[in-house]
Amino acid sequence: MGGKDFQIYMDYHEKSGTGAKSPDNIEADTKSRRKTSKTEWSLFPGFYDRIVSVFGLPEIDLFVSRTSAKCQRYVSWDSDPEAFAIDAFTLYWKLFFFDVFLPFAILPKVLQKIAYDKAIGFLVVPYWKTQSWYPLFTSLLTKVLIVLRPHTNMLNCSDRVHPMGSSLNLVAGILSGTPS
């Protein structure tokens, strides 16, 4: 069906009302409303518990969804009626002891926000010493790092395991934007 034929088809069905209406098309309607992230990786609870046993329980979880939040209070990426707020970058982080485990691509922005807000919390990041953000990460550290050795089940997203889980070294540290 070419472009013109498709447009004629669509015009006909819109005018005649023969397209499937939402109540009649339950499967498509349900799938279109479901919010699932295929990229929101989360630490397996045992690894997270190890970090919390050393650093303490955070007050708020930043950059998560309802399904991946580890704290009762969390800040979501997207509209969520149960979230404390949407978009963690709009908050003043100094008010909370937070935890962050996020897409690695925004680590530089997160580290700058910690420094700017003079905030304190813990981050879990890849042990990538050659990355441009790593010196800033180490300059904000207040305690020794917790090293999380590679493990197949270390990172999960719904029922999937991360393809790099068995080879990725992660580190966790408390960071503070207040100079010591």
What are these regions (language model features)?
Residues S167-A172:
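Short hydrophobic/aromatic beta-strand or adjacent loop that forms the aromatic wall/cage
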Residues M1-H151, I174-T178:
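Acidic, metal-ion-coordinating active-site neighborhood of RNase H-like domains
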Residues L148-G165:
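Active-site capping/gating segments
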